[in-house]
Amino acid sequence: MTATDPAPTPLAQGWCALSLLHGRIEAHIERALQAKHDLSVREYSLLDVLSRQHDGDGGHLQMKQVADAVVLSQSATTRLVTRLEDRLLLTRYLCPTDRRGIYTNVTEAGLKLLAQARPTNDTALREALDEAARNPELAPLVRVVESLNVPA
């Protein structure tokens, strides 16, 4: 940026701060989950989303729903699901009423790993937020995140 470049608008500054906060939180959680459970943030998120879907053992979603839930393209989601399926943490099966549909289901091993990883995720999230709260640029965003009362 040179002296003649226009200053970012408050909206752009806010977006940059939000992006910075997200990146720092995700990186901190990623390191913790990888070190203790050999899971990426995306893998953890997918197991978490599927664990909240209830249809008998574990949970299931169609692949498009999985992609939307973990905010990935369908091709990236397929690769993510394949990695977890190879580790026996997920299974895929055809939809019984629409043979074109493929469901993804979390396994008992996936639920067990998720239960072990959840405290690590929560602790890392708290640590990342506490660290970010010490940054004057990020502190207001941290307060907003902490004040949210989103239903589970």
What is the predicted function of each stretch?
Residues 27-73:
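N-terminal helix-turn-helix DNA-binding core of bacterial DNA-binding proteins
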Residues 2, 82-139:
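Charged, amphipathic alpha-helical coiled-coil/dimerization segments
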Residues 1-39, 87-89, 139:
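N-terminal leader segment of winged-helix/HTH proteins
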Residues 48, 115, 142:
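A cross-family signal for key residues in well-ordered alpha-helices
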Residues 138-152:
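Exposed, interaction-prone assembly regions rather than primary DNA-binding/catalytic cores
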Residues 20, 24, 28, 32, ...:
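Solvent-exposed, charged/polar functional surfaces in cytosolic regulatory/catalytic domains
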